[in-house]
Amino acid sequence: MPGLFDTLNLATRSMQAQQAGVTVSGQNLANINNPAYSRQRVNLQTSDPVPLVGGIQGTGVEVAGIQQIRDGLLDNQIRDEGSVGGFWTTAQSALGNTQTELGEFLNGTAAASNGSANTSSTASAQGLSTQLNNLFSAFESVASDPTSLSQRQVLVSQAQSLAGSFNQIATRLDGVNQNLNSSVSNDVDSANKLLSDIASLNSDIAKTEAATGSTANDLRDLRQQKLESLAQLTNLQTSTASDGSLTVSIGGVAMVSGSKITDTLQAYDPGNGQLQVRAAVAGTALTLTGGSIAGAIDTRDGALANLRTGLDNLASQLIGKVNSVYSAGYDLNGNTGADFFTGTNAATIGVNANLANDPSQVQAAGAAGSVGDNTVALALAQLAQQANGALGNQTFSGAYAQTVTDLGNSLANANDQVANHDAVSSMLAQQRDSVSGVSMEEELTNLMTYQKAYQASAQIISTVNLMLQTVIAMKTT
């Protein structure tokens, strides 16, 4: 039959098991505000029994292991949703900055119709839409009073303001474009740093788990945090090896395999000044569909490029159409053949420098020496209402309104996508918190349970100690 020392060992093992429980609960409570931490649980099991003549004698309890409470599927969903959020948050920010630089406030519901500029986008007082209207109004004012130098001076000033706005917008859009290129470059560097961290954690996890036979819970938490940070930069795929390490692939190219970095991301210029991303070792151009890197590239090459193309086309057509009519006109001195606008696009459009110094050189008449002739000025004013095939059969104002509308729709879509992501992300976070989060009430209850069990085990030891003293006293008498 079992002796007192067997009972003493049983109680000692019980105290050790309860102490492990207290330690784990303490670890959970210490990390209650750590968003990367997943709750841990001590798993207890009956220790191996001892066969006796009279039957089987239990030996108490022991720690089977410390389990990390995680839902792998939920973790993957959160990681993937992070890529969605990274993409659309970057797009939203870039499009919002573009709206600011354009000088128009967009609500995303504007729609150009009948070639007019009447849309539900709200133009600022000095926006391009207003200045286009001011230009053609100034042509009309010259036509109404063709001998007035002051009206001609107003026309030149309005044209200079319009050209200056085109120039400023082009410069600002270049700045947005450069910022997106910088974002791509910086995010690629950040992604490579995270890949290096993940490879290092893979090594630590594999070594720790091989040496201890236990799951490296805290290291796995940190690796998951790194993966989620990486997913915000780019979409990725993972697979788990038998030693607990991960293989991380981006765009179909393995970047990390166990403790080794097999490839890295590289931002490169394909020759057009617009950074793209490839695998540095494999040399493969990567098609990224999620994360902030893809969001920056997609916005830059999509909505921003379309906006710039639309503005350049508008400026080019304005220059060409106005100059075509204007160059056939005559100024107050009988001169003809000069152009009104200079340049070829939004960045280079300007006004004939001679006109600023001498508004009498404005060519408003249809024939030389015809005092009061407004033929050309009137024809120029009428350009405002003429549909242009190169502008999608829209007027100048209508084409600009459509360009603004397209940007507004892109921004509205990005806003919707970010709102949807926030809702999904919040729901997933709540689900994970219910699984892996630390509950203070639960841990305090566990602490009390472990404490009482520990005290009970200590009482067993005290009782056995008294019994041993009795036995010893009997043998000494």
Regions found by a protein language model. Name each.
Residues M1-T477:
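Structural signature of extracellular appendage/secretion-system components
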